[in-house]
Amino acid sequence: MAIYHLHVKVIGRKAGSSAVASAAYRSASRMRDQRIDRVQDFSNKRGVVHSEVMLPDGAPEHLSDRERLWNDVEASEVRKDAQLAREVEFSIPREMTQAQGIELARDFAQAEFVDQGMIADLNVHWDIGEDGMPKLHAHVMLTMRSVDENGFGPKVRDWNRTEMVERWRERWAEHVNERLAELDIDARIDHRSLEAQGIGLEPQTKIGAPAQRMEVAGIEADRAEDHRRIARENGERIIADPSTALDAITQQQSTFTRRDMAMLAH
């Protein structure tokens, strides 16, 4: 059952983040952060199945080197609270093979980011979810300044507009659905909220690994409890009116299994 997920965030110094460390982690590589003279080594991290820096037309070739790229980004920002990069993270349908997922992620990054003038640092991760199934997703770190043969220029304010995020959300759904149709895969995703789709279920929160570790350690994790509450309440809604689940799942695929129904409720 294909699941829609696309999240956009800014990586900045105000939150104590480093563009170099962020890029090293997402690419499972070892990089030196020249600004603070520290090596960021995440080379033991597993699950990175594809990694590349994609340059727009006119960008100097040396910026295809990830370490050089993000050190140059750090050097171009002087403010203590500087915004360094934008990250777009999205889930790739499990119905696709690894190669198909990588191709889809590359095509999306090229059309929506690189062709618009951004440098895209793309990393595709293949993890195993809690249910033991493959969990294919991508992280794209994006530059925030214009770039030409001389290097970085001013920041492009249009890329910060809320409308851009809404466009990327919609365009990701379109890219995915077009590719699923081309591959003759019976699944679809929808970027709209459940309410906008006319589905009477509450959106499910996402529990990340930190929240799971906190619970194991006996520390209260509000997001984990909220996740379980929503799952219970959605399950109650489905029991009271099974057509709610039928409406939701048939918008994504024409056939489904008991497991698909369980995933919807959970």
Could you describe each region identified by the protein language model?
Residues M1-H266:
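N-terminal nicking endonuclease/strand-transfer module with a His-rich metal-binding environment
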